[in-house]
Amino acid sequence: LELHLDRIYPNRDIVAIKTNNIASYTDVLVTCMRQNPKWILLSEVRSAEAVMAVRNSISSGHNILSTIHADKASSVPMRLYSLLESNQDVGQFLATIHRYVQLAICVKGYMSKELGRFQREIMEVCEFYVDENNNPCSNVIYRKNIGGGFVIKNPSKYLLEYLDLQ
């Protein structure tokens, strides 16, 4: 999808860059940041290099939208950490992720017998933030239960303040 957005939205200011054996995640994200975009869409975070490139980009104030394979939204920070190949301090890494990643959304896909087609559903939405004492925190604001019911909680003041600034 991300490589075709310029064709889907021809009147939008979109630049698509693909990584390969010459241009790495780091190279591509540095090039993107030089263009000062509002958003960077990274197809998938699946390597230590991608994790570090994303972390460096978001900590410099750039907004990134990406995907990652995780069992639920609330486990995304630890999933990012598990992709690292270094012995970086887990507490420091998680604090950085909680400071700069506002939301994670878990989408599950399945074959719907009722609809006779592949279906995707949002299963969990989790916000991340660092509180007044600099502690990394998370708040699951939506979760769909196996039985079909769901749980909804209010977002924190941190997410509301962030959204007000956007």
Predicted features, each with a name:
Residues 115-166:
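NTP-binding/hydrolysis catalytic cores, primarily Walker-type P-loop NTPases
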Residues 1-96:
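Switch/coupling sub-region of P-loop NTPases
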Residues 82-104, 108-116:
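Cys/His-rich Zn2+-binding cysteine-cluster or related metal-binding knuckle/ribbon modules and their
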Residues 12, 63, 100-104, 120-123:
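Active-site lining segments that contact anionic ligands and/or coordinate catalytic metals
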Residues 35, 56-62, 101-109, 133-134, ...:
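Short flexible/disordered coil segments
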Residues 17-19, 109, 127-130:
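Active-site donor-binding loop signature of nucleotide-sugar glycosyltransferases
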